[in-house]
From Swiss-Prot:
Its cofactor is Mg(2+). Residues 20-194 form the Exonuclease domain. Mg(2+) 1 binds at residue 23. This is Ribonuclease T. The active site is at 181 (proton donor/acceptor).
Length: 223
């Protein structure tokens, strides 16, 4: 591999992690008891010059799992009617199986060894996706069990804003508040925001960084 490829490859940029932007809409705040109602995923790619851009997208309305709690306040907030047949909702298994398949394909093509969730206030989205994957008994979950890239934190650092809409505007991106709290729209905007932050850091000279003195001393995942 050439030096230039080493500097611009997705796997080298994030230490073997494959970033995947996720957003969920739910019927509450408890990932174990409240329904997952909508999920979207956007994968990312790097061009030959090392600039990050969105790649593939998947979006699903999701059927509440058996016994799931539907909090009225949450439904009023996101405007979702879980029982509307026009939603075309699928099971948690079908939604996550398709997303995981897309992610594993992208990991292989990018020479990455583990997917990492990118999300705005990522702990929330991560907890719901992981709980749904466990309920669906999906064994080949490509995502790291606890490491995430949180665009709320990154936006606070890079842009001085932590709310998604305000962070997008601060980054010079449009944000349509009438489409907010749609998993698809929020995921697409979060993907663009993450790409802008990563690319801005590169434009400012923050990437690439000098190589570590002793790569064999690099801590392993979770250390």
């Amino acid at each position: 591999m050439s030096d230039n490829a080493q500097l611009t490859g997705l796997s080298d940029r994030f230490r073997g992690f494959y970033p995947v932007v996720i957003d969920v809409e739910t019927a509450g705040f408890n990932a174990k008891t409240d329904a997952l109602l909508e999920i979207a995923a956007v994968t990312l790619k790097m061009d030959a010059d090392g600039w990050l851009t969105p790649d593939e997208t998947l979006h699903f309305h999701v059927e509440p799992f058996e016994g799931a709690i539907l909090q009225p306040e949450a439904l009023a907030f996101n405007g979702i009617d879980p029982h509307n047949p026009l939603r075309g909702a699928v099971s948690e298994y079908d939604a996550l199986h398709a997303i995981f398949k897309m992610v594993r394909k992208g990991m292989k093509e990018s020479n990455c060894n583990r997917a990492i969730m990118v999300a705005h206030n990522a702990t929330f989205d991560h907890s719901f996706m992981m709980a749904a994957a466990e309920r669906a008994s999906l064994k080949r979950n490509p995502f790291h069990p606890f490491v995430t890239f949180d665009t709320a934190a990154l936006s606070g650092l890079a842009l001085g804003q932590t709310v998604l809409a305000k962070a997008c505007i601060a980054a010079g991106m449009p944000f349509d508040s009438t489409q907010a709290h749609s998993a698809l729209y929020d995921t697409e905007q979060t993907a663009l925001l993450f790409c802008e932050i990563v690319n801005r850091w590169k434009r400012l000279g923050g990437w690439p960084v000098p190589p570590l003195a002793a790569e064999d001393a690099t801590p392993q995942d979770g250390e």
